[in-house]
């Protein structure tokens, strides 16, 4: 049995072209009729008359044949048009039959799971509506989640995207109503599929825009959904961007945060008055609090904060293994992995090195005692955990361009769009701002964090002291040679200047209120105090040295 494939639209087009050809031929025949059927004799003799009569007869025969061909051509064109209509009708009937058959078949397949679980076995979930804003779940076996409903009422959270079953993608979250949070993206399939993107936060002409919805997470294989963008607020800034979803347990990239704020600022929390802390997402592990430390260079985190052992596998082979230490008495072994760092609000680095702690050991009485005490409450506590427990962080983000380590890179310098040229630490304002300095400088010091400062004790002559301007140094240190003894004297005023002219003060304190640790040798450490007094901008220029800029309070 032979099969003929017909495209009705082609038949209709061919018929139209035939009609166009017929019109052209008719016009040509009409133009040729008089010259070819009414030939005049060249002369009055019998031969000329016979020749003219002969050729005129040929013209008349041609016109008769042309008339017959024109009628045939018109009939053929009508037949083509009729055939196209017949095939279109047959095709529409076939589609209708197949649709009905498909609905019947899938209806029979999905009926048991619809009755028991309220979702199909195969098929996409229904999109959200005003009365039921959350997208429906996709088929248990195969199908995408439905799209969440975008709200029109003020303050109403956008509908969540539906989750997939075994295979399929999560549905996108819906946009929030005015000032409200966008809906969360649905999760991807348990086996394979990507998470849905979070819904956009609701715009708000009277206040702050809504927060973007969370991106959906993947199952075993698939990418996490990106977080939704924050809604536009009255100030022109966006609301906070939603966090991205986690990538596949075995394979898949994580979703990045949605655009938010002004595109260069993230919240900064001050813990215990002394610790500037922000949250980062590395390799899709989870949001992790890290200390902003101008006294070091490089991001140091633990295995649990980069997705665990499987997270290490997803990052591939390390680019290096090394050891480093913190001055308070903690030594650690780490491996450097290439990955990205997400600061939130869509601020994400290009691939950069992140140091993952593999093993740590306390090397001071303080660090050892802290660890042993922590073991009583949690036997799985690592020395690294215990060392930074009081700071409320799980890692350290070193941002100092001329700090000694651990390196090998500073993630904030891997930000694009000009955001990698520096950062502002505003502890009292509660902000970490990337890119050019947004405030007015008061004075600057060459070097970040290592620089030479001048120290005066009780108004005496200043002494040049090599120092670390260290946001993570808590109370800091002071060399015994500066104060003339191994013990910090009471009722003593310490003033730190930019140079020996004593015209520009960096900071000052009374030893009754601020008590740095006395050291026998090494660099003086400012501790957190200068950063608490006023905003400080770390400029990565000149390369390898940097500049510490103190902005107007």
Swiss-Prot record:
Single GO MF descriptor: aspartic-type endopeptidase activity
UniProt PTM comment: Undergoes auto-proteolytic processing.
Gene Ontology cellular component list: cell surface; extracellular region
Subcellular location: Secreted; Cell surface
UniProt keyword terms in alphabetical order: Aspartyl protease, Hydrolase, Protease, Secreted, Virulence
Organism superkingdom: Bacteria
Active-site residues, Swiss-Prot/TrEMBL: 293
Consequences of knocking out this gene: Disruption of the gene does not affect LipY surface localization. Mutant shows moderate attenuation in the zebrafish larva infection model.
PE domain mapped to chain residues: 1-92
Biological process terms in GO annotation: proteolysis
Chain's role: Aspartic protease that processes the lipase LipY and other PE_PGRS proteins. Can also cleave itself. Cleaves LipY both inside the PE domain, before amino acid 98, and after amino acids 136 and 149. Involved in virulence.
Family assignment from sequence similarity: Belongs to the mycobacterial PE family. PGRS subfamily.
Family matches, as NCBIfam families: PE_process_PecA
Designated name of the protein: PE cleavage protein A
Organism: Mycobacterium marinum (strain ATCC BAA-535 / M)
Organism lineage string: Bacteria, Bacillati, Actinomycetota, Actinomycetes, Mycobacteriales
């Amino acid at each position: 049995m032979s099969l003929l494939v017909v495209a009705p639209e082609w038949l209709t087009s061919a018929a139209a072209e035939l009609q166009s050809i017929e019109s052209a031929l008719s016009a040509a025949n009409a133009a040729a009729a008089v010259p070819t059927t009414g030939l005049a004799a060249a002369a009055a003799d019998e031969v000329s008359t016979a020749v003219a009569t002969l050729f005129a007869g040929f013209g008349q025969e041609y016109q008769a044949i042309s008339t017959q061909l024109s009628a045939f051509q018109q009939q053929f064109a009508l037949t083509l048009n009729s055939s196209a209509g017949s095939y279109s009708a047959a095709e529409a009937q076939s589609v209708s039959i197949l649709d009905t058959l498909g609905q019947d078949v899938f209806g029979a397949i999905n009926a048991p799971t619809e009755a028991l679980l309220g979702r199909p076995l195969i098929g996409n979930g229904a999109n959200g509506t005003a009365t039921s804003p959350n997208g429906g779940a996709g088929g248990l076996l195969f199908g995408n989640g439905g799209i969440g409903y975008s709200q029109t009422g003020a303050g109403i959270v956008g509908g969540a995207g539906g989750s997939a079953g075994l295979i399929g993608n999560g549905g996108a979250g819906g946009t929030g109503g005015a000032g409200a949070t966008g809906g969360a993206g649905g999760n991807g399939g348990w086996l394979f599929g990507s998470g849905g993107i979070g819904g956009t936060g609701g715009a708000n002409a009277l206040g702050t825009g809504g927060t973007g919805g969370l991106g959906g997470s993947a199952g075993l294989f698939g990418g996490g959904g990106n977080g939704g963008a924050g809604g536009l607020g009255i100030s022109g800034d966006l609301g906070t961007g939603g966090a991205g979803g986690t990538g596949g347990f075995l394979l898949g990239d994580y979703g990045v945060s949605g655009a938010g704020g002004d595109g260069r600022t993230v919240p900064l929390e001050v813990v215990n008055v002394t610790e500037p802390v922000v949250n980062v997402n590395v390799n899709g592990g989870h949001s992790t609090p890290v200390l902003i430390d101008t006294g070091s260079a490089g991001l140091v985190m633990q295995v649990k904060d980069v997705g665990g052992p499987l997270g290490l596998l997803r990052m591939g082979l390390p680019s290096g293994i090394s050891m480093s230490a913190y001055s308070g008495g903690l030594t650690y072994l780490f491996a450097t992995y290439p990955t990205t760092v997400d600061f939130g609000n869509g601020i994400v680095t290009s691939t950069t090195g992140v140091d993952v702690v593999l093993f740590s050991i306390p090397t001071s009485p303080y660090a050892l005692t802290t660890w042993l005490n922590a073991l009583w409450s949690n036997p799985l506590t690592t020395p690294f955990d215990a060392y930074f427990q009081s700071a409320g962080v799980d890692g350290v983000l070193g941002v100092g361009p001329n700090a000694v380590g651990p390196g090998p890179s500073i993630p904030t310098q891997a930000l694009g769009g000009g955001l990698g040229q520096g950062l502002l630490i505003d502890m009292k304002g509660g902000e970490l701002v990337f890119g050019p300095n947004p405030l007015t400088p008061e004075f600057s010091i060459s070097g970040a964090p290592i620089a030479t400062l001048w120290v005066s004790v009780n108004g005496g002559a200043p002494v040049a002291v090599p120092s670390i301007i260290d946001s993570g140094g808590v109370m800091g240190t002071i060399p015994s040679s500066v104060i003339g003894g191994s013990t910090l004297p009471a009722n003593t005023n310490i003033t730190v200047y930019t140079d020996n002219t004593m015209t520009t003060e960096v900071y000052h304190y009374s030893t009754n209120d601020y008590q740095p640790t006395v050291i026998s040798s090494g660099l003086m450490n400012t501790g957190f105090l200068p950063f608490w007094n006023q905003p400080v901008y770390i400029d990565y220029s000149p390369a390898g040295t940097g500049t510490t800029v103190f902005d107007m309070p």
